[in-house]
Amino acid sequence: MTMPHRYMFLAVFTLLALTSVASGATEACLPAGQRKSGMNINFYQYSLKDSSTYSNAAYMAYGYASKTKLGSVGGQTDISIDYNIPCVSSSGTFPCPQEDSYGNWGCKGMGACSNSQGIAYWSTDLFGFYTTPTNVTLEMTGYFLPPQTGSYTFKFATVDDSAILSVGGATAFNCCAQQQPPITSTNFTIDGIKPWGGSLPPNIEGTVYMYAGYYYPMKVVYSNAVSWGTLPISVTLPDGTTVSDDFEGYVYSFDDDLSQSNCTVPDPSNYAVSTTTTTTEPWTGTFTSTSTEMTTVTGTNGVPTDETVIVIRTPTTASTIITTTEPWNSTFTSTSTELTTVTGTNGVRTDETIIVIRTPTTATTAITTTEPWNSTFTSTSTELTTVTGTNGLPTDETIIVIRTPTTATTAMTTTQPWNDTFTSTSTELTTVTGTNGLPTDETIIVIRTPTTATTAMTTTQPWNDTFTSTSTELTTVTGTNGLPTDETIIVIRTPTTATTAMTTTQPWNDTFTSTSTEITTVTGTNGLPTDETIIVIRTPTTATTAMTTPQPWNDTFTSTSTEMTTVTGTNGLPTDETIIVIRTPTTATTAITTTEPWNSTFTSTSTEMTTVTGTNGLPTDETIIVIRTPTTATTAITTTQPWNDTFTSTSTEMTTVTGTNGLPTDETIIVIRTPTTATTAMTTTQPWNDTFTSTSTEITTVTGTTGLPTDETIIVIRTPTTATTAMTTTQPWNDTFTSTSTEMTTVTGTNGVPTDETVIVIRTPTSEGLISTTTEPWTGTFTSTSTEMTTVTGTNGQPTDETVIVIRTPTSEGLVTTTTEPWTGTFTSTSTEMTTITGTNGVPTDETVIVIRTPTSEGLISTTTEPWTGTFTSTSTEMTTITGTNGQPTDETVIVIRTPTSEGLISTTTEPWTGTFTSTSTEMTHVTGTNGVPTDETVIVIRTPTSEGLISTTTEPWTGTFTSTSTEVTTITGTNGQPTDETVIVIRTPTSEGLISTTTEPWTGTFTSTSTEMTTVTGTNGQPTDETVIVIRTPTSEGLVTTTTEPWTGTFTSTSTEMSTVTGTNGLPTDETVIVVKTPTTAISSSLSSSSSGQITSSITSSRPIITPFYPSNGTSVISSSVISSSVTSSLFTSSPVISSSVISSSTTTSTSIFSESSKSSVIPTSSSTSGSSESETSSAGSVSSSSFISSESSKSPTYSSSSLPLVTSATTSQETASSLPPATTTKTSEQTTLVTVTSCESHVCTESISPAIVSTATVTVSGVTTEYTTWCPISTTETTKQTKGTTEQTTETTKQTTVVTISSCESDVCSKTASPAIVSTSTATINGVTTEYTTWCPISTTESRQQTTLVTVTSCESGVCSETASPAIVSTATATVNDVVTVYPTWRPQTANEESVSSKMNSATGETTTNTLAAETTTNTVAAETITNTGAAETKTVVTSSLSRSNHAETQTASATDVIGHSSSVVSVSETGNTKSLTSSGLSTMSQQPRSTPASSMVGYSTASLEISTYAGSANSLLAGSGLSVFIASLLLAII
């Protein structure tokens, strides 16, 4: 991973971590100064139409303050922005809302507007401040005062152009420092920054948890660049109230006071105080009503207090209320009520209500004041003061002010313990206001239970009456621990209305359980309002654990009972457990359990009713059980177990586990017991914006891969979108069901950044077979994971039960890559990470990395890629046993990757890395194949460890319809005798898809990449064949690339790569990459043919050797001596009737192209041009036959080949070559004579002789790289041979013999054949035991084409001195038609006294020689030579062409080549290469020009390489008259120039 990616991940992680901290404990303030209503607003300069500055987060956070400050206003409570630019119309000037604008600047109701939208307008529309609302940045600061404790959601409905909102100290601004310069925090609560013309962020909102009574710093920064400006701001309070635009009563300002030390409150939750107050009120009812409310008030000391207000309303009737106050040692006031009947002194019986108030024995006095108000809820506040009583003593007095609203009945049950032996129940009636603001008649049922060991069970039943009835029964039940328990059954009969019962459990410090009931209205997930009965159960804060078990039954209502038992957790510790059994009707509803964190110390459970539509399209009534758990350090683990009952049971246990990071964690285990029916449990993970994990369950019916319908239970786990990563680990175990648990740990990813990771451990039964993971894309915004069961048949023919884990990933999150890692565990673990990578096309892509950790004890891991008709990539795993190439059986884990056949080709790239395992990932790119058609390509990148030795790729055919890639490890002994661990990548390709060709290309990467492309070629039989091209890209920095071909008995071609170090003739060691191609010993032959119709010959003969340079189509020379000396057959360049064939003495024959992407190149015409009025550019490209010459050079230098002649060529390079095509080439030639030893062989008898030879040296400079070439050419015509001192190469040549050949001559499209004697020259080359024989037929006399003569000016240069002479010359012309493009090739050859012989001394081209041509007309002569030669096992048909043209124009500079090399990625046209001069020796001038009338669309694809050709033209001039072999060399020369 690149460093920018590391920094990007670190920034994202830090931002998310800060967001998480902020959401958990937002810093608040308690400024002591004078409070002022509203916010302060500062205005700053912003440039009109600046479309980039406001897109910078740093500018929006603090950078704006560096601009010019225009002014400020204060006391603003209406803080939303809605600015409309003016429309100047015929009827006047009016503001035009943006939604009313139309067309080319018109406004509804006003008509066309004559003014411009893109200029600055001045007005006071922004908070009364005169500025340019069209282009301005403003900052709003103030303190937000929350009236309630809970989550506040701030929202921007839209943004035009850019805005942010921050809440909290050290985020918006520091406490008591509102007017200070802005701080640099970019931890925005709302990030509404959007680029110019871009779309808005998806959810322009943010949530902050705040505590009532504290002041929270709040800052809004807004920028507008041009025209309209819009920023609507709203906030939703914890009770659901939404405040929009006008924030009066919520936002305030304070003057700065940097000296106030207690201004900052880092975590307000640590400062909250809880008190309980009791208020007694008279009323006109006939009974006493008691209600309880929770509120938070801020006292005169500025400290907020959580307050429980118990309101007791007593009747003012003839009954008597007696209040008894008793002191006690507790710290709160307790109030209880009793009912009795007394007989007064008048003998009349009176019902008497005794209110016993127990007050703390402190000196404080509690005064309660009740006031009415117009709100919909009851407000309670507490103040502390000191009063002086009538006895003159001061007393601390607590004044409780209760404000009640001036406004259906609810049954509230209060349970109290007492010392009697029976249960007493009384009922009272009152009216309370619920959380929805509606008044409710409330029936208070006071249940006094004995303080014995009995358990109170509450059962709720519906009935047809309009009130709630409560009765009590006593029974004895046996719990799950086998112990009998006295149980008090409280039967509550409630009216059969459409209400929903929600149970909330709260802890308290008493020794009994209290149950109360309230009525409210909630809106479910289906948007429908539901009346909800809230049953509040207060349980003692003992060490017991509350377990809720839902059970179905046949009644029409929900019953709740409680049992006591003792269970032993997974940590072996016994736990007292309270089992709350909820019996629900057996209707079609589905129970969903949602777990939410909250700041309390107990677990609360509530229930809601809603209707959802499952994945099968059917609506389902759903009961949502909301479990609120304390936000402590414990982790909630959900375990699913089957059982034999007919309902789902949920229980909770506490245990302590040690995570993978070695830290102990308190863990809450939620055990969900599901019926052992035919349903399947599927777990789906969804992200959401909350801070806790929610789990719900749905029922649906799916059709598995077996075609059978299955009832499926979908468990939806919603996880917070924090910086943590959800990792799913699958483990086998010996149980019969699947268990899912969650752990928290911290891991360090491949980018070096630590990440909090949620590990979801899925334990599956080991009897259910293998586990396969399938990844599917979908349109959702989160990753969903489900599980299916199926039966598959492995490669060994055995059926296997397979658990398919289907991971659905969002298609908007980028690519999905699968990485396989070994580990020491005994099971396969799958986790998911998010990263951003840059593909080969330079485009960054969000990538989901699926890391599959497989056990290292299960053998090797092979990856098989299969196409299928699906639209996503599926990954599954199978187990099999294979026998490797060393004969040893190996357990193999086969990872089958099924890719969609509509996504294009699949290529496999192997990269080394420093890891200890093999990683496989997938990327998407666009490539252009050899047929010129762009194809979407899926690149499978296999990263293998560099410590495991070499990586070889073996290609095997098979009968499958897809390409399979697997990996084996073996140990081989290289050519240097050293054993090497080799990773063999076996690629099995289908035999029905045609031929398989391997192309080797150099590149700048540091590893070898292997990819596969599909193309269609037409063979010599005229039949099209589908061809699979395996492109192997090898690094150019690793030294030379050598290809060695070996026969073997296999039925396919295997390609492997070895590394070796060789010492060249220059004494320098060179790293060499040896590509070993093993070909089957069957009769595989390759025939080459020309790719166009042009057949061109020339009547010039020569006998001098020529050096032929080679460049691949991408401009980098990569052919080493080993490559050139391999058994390779390709076509020759010639312009004379020369027949050349190669026969390999063994049964192995193969065809290899030296070009990067063309494995079938056989004819490559070249062209060069020169002009009479200006210097011209010259390009050449070609492919020649392999030959038996010796070439050595230093590492990374260009490599050249010569013709098949007895010569020795050496090359040295002064520096490393560049990787691109050389823009210019300079050639220098010098000569000297020396004596050489020539070895001649005939009939396997060899002799040596001494012969004088011309030593010719030439240098070529390509992009600053200079290479020197030395050639020894024997002067005499006596045939000699030389045996080289090499370990792998040996060159011999036999004496010549003569024969008669048939020559085809063509002129004006009319061809004739003539018989001519020819010299037969044969030579053999033995390379690594493979012998190749080369035979050349050179006609002794040739039929020359019709010639015309003209005068040419020949410039001769020697030793830097040039002279010009006029000489008659023979004009020889030829035409070639390639893809309907006709090219005329003229040659001017100056006449000499002896046409058949020229001086044996080569011209020295130490300077630049320019040849000016004066001829104005061209005639066309065409001579064709076609020879078919049968040589034993191999048949080669060679048709050779060369191209030369002339013209007296200088504007056009064109080089053409056949389209077989037109797909190079580094093609450079002549018109782009600069001024490369065409240099020739005296005696030969060539010129080429494409006809000016030729359309550009008809041009043939070409590849060019700039090289000055003066040496080669001069050499050809020196070889015009000679023996047979010289024809071959001269022909090559003319083809090049």
UniProtKB/Swiss-Prot annotation:
Q: Where are the sequence repeats?
A: 278-322, 323-367, 368-412, 413-457, 458-502, 503-547, 548-592, 593-637, 638-682, 683-727, 728-772, 773-817, 818-862, 863-907, 908-952, 953-997, 998-1042, 1043-1087, 1118-1137, 1138-1157, 1226-1276, 1291-1341, 1342-1392, 1408-1416, 1417-1425, 1426-1434
Q: Which InterPro entries does the UniProt entry name for this protein?
A: Flocculin, PA14/GLEYA, PA14_dom
Among the GO molecular function terms of this UniProt record, one is: D-mannose binding
Q: Where is this region: 2 X 20 AA approximate tandem repeats, Ser/Thr-rich?
A: 1118-1157
The known PTMs are summarized as:
Extensively N- and O-glycosylated.
Determine if Ribosomal protein is one of this entry's keywords.
no
> Composition bias, kind Low complexity: at what positions?
773-795, 863-885, 998-1020, 1161-1220, 1405-1414
Q: What does this protein do?
A: Cell wall protein that participates directly in adhesive cell-cell interactions during yeast flocculation, a reversible, asexual and Ca(2+)-dependent process in which cells adhere to form aggregates (flocs) consisting of thousands of cells. The lectin-like protein sticks out of the cell wall of flocculent cells and selectively binds mannose residues in the cell walls of adjacent cells. Activity is inhibited by mannose, but not by glucose, maltose, sucrose or galactose. Also involved in cell-substrate adhesion.
Q: Where is this region: 18 X 45 AA approximate tandem repeats, Thr-rich?
A: 278-1087
UniProt lineage: Eukaryota, Fungi, Dikarya, Ascomycota, Saccharomycotina
Q: What is this protein called?
A: Flocculation protein FLO1
Q: According to its UniProt record, where is this protein located? A: Cell membrane; Secreted, Cell wall
Q: How is it used?
A: For many industrial applications in which the yeast S.cerevisiae is used, e.g. beer, wine and alcohol production, appropriate flocculation behavior is one of the most important characteristics of a good production strain. The ability of yeast cells to flocculate is of considerable importance, as it provides an effective, environment-friendly, simple and cost-free way to separate yeast cells from the fermentation product at the end of fermentation.
Positions of the PA14 domain: 74-249
